[in-house]
Amino acid sequence: MIIFCTPLSEYEKIILKINNYLLPKTIITDVGSSKERSIELIRKILKKGISWTSSHPIAGSEVSGPEHGKKNLFLNKWCILIKEKNTNKKHIEVLSKFWKKVGSRVAIMDSKKHDTVFSMTSHLPHLIAYNLVKTATDFEKQQRYEL
C-alpha cells in the first residue's frame, strides 16, 4: 500500500518516479481534501492497469508535521473513500478495513459529491473566516488613518 501524504502539487513528480515499479495489485491512495482535480491529474499520468483509490480522513488540526502527530488521530473520525466507475472494489475493501483498523468510521462517495460536500462544510467556512479577519484588519488600519 502506498499513501500519498503530500501536497497535490507533488503528486505528479512522485508518480513519475514510481510508475515503473507499480503493480496492478498495488493499493495507492492519498489523504488530500480535493478529489476531482487530483483524480483527473492522476488518471492522465498513472501507468495503464494501475488503480488509484482516493481517501480523505477528516482528522487533523491547523498544525502539520510529524512533531504534531497524535496516537489516536483517526479515532472516531470519518474517512471518506472515493469510489468511481472504474475503482477497484477489492482496493475499496482493503482501504475500508485499514481505516477502520486505525479507528476511523468509513463512508463511500464519488469525487463530485465529496468535493461539493466539503466545499460547503469545510472550505467555505475557511474562506469566510479569512475574509472576516482581513475585513477587521483593514477596518483597524482605516480607523488608525482617520485618527
Please identify what each model-predicted range represents.
Residues 1-3, 29:
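N-terminal Rossmann-like NAD(P) cofactor-binding module of classical short-chain dehydrogenase/reductase
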Residues 5-7, 32, 83:
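Glycine-rich, N-terminal phosphate-binding loop of Rossmann-like dinucleotide-binding domains
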Residues 14-66:
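Rossmann-like NAD(P)(H) cofactor-binding subdomain of soluble oxidoreductases
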Residues 3-5, 59-60:
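Short acidic/polar alpha-helix capping motifs at helix-coil junctions
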Residues 71-147:
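Internal alpha-helical scaffold of NAD(P)-dependent oxidoreductase catalytic cores
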